[in-house]
Amino acid sequence: KAIEIDPKYAAAHYNKGVLYDKLLQHEEAIESLDEALKCDSGNVNTAFYRGIVFGKMKKHEQALNCFENIIRKHPKHMDAFFHKGIELAELGKHEKAIEIFDKILQIHGNNVNVVYAISRSNAAMGNIDKALYLLEQAIKKDRKTIKKWAIEDEFFDSLLDEPKFRKLVK
């Protein structure tokens, strides 16, 4: 209704995009977020959320571009840096992803999500001991969530037969 009254109401387009995302209607979410950005091109939250939705759609290059554009304009946007690392990992660029994650850890200490992200990239690269060590550190900080993520994460598929991995996630 708000969009009918004012088609240039960026917040209404953003909210519509969020709702579409929650309904797993990602193409429609992107369309609404694009409309929001047409109304308010400088809205960082909308641009960021657009990157998140592209990531959910497995459109990792587009997601990466969203996060890189945010970082160019807002070089201290740590969430954009983190998600840039995630998208690099999804594209198989694990060394670059780990470089980003290491920089975040230098600034923000032992963030459990970042430690987990480094673990999964190490698993994907075959650095089993390091992956398991970091996974163990992450599990110590957030047992329930990290175990669930690790079990479902394809980056850890190569570790499914590893006794230490099975022990960590049971």
Predicted regions and their residues:
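Structural signature of tandem alpha-helical TPR/SEL1-like repeats
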Residues: K1, K22-E35, K56-N69, L91-K103, ...
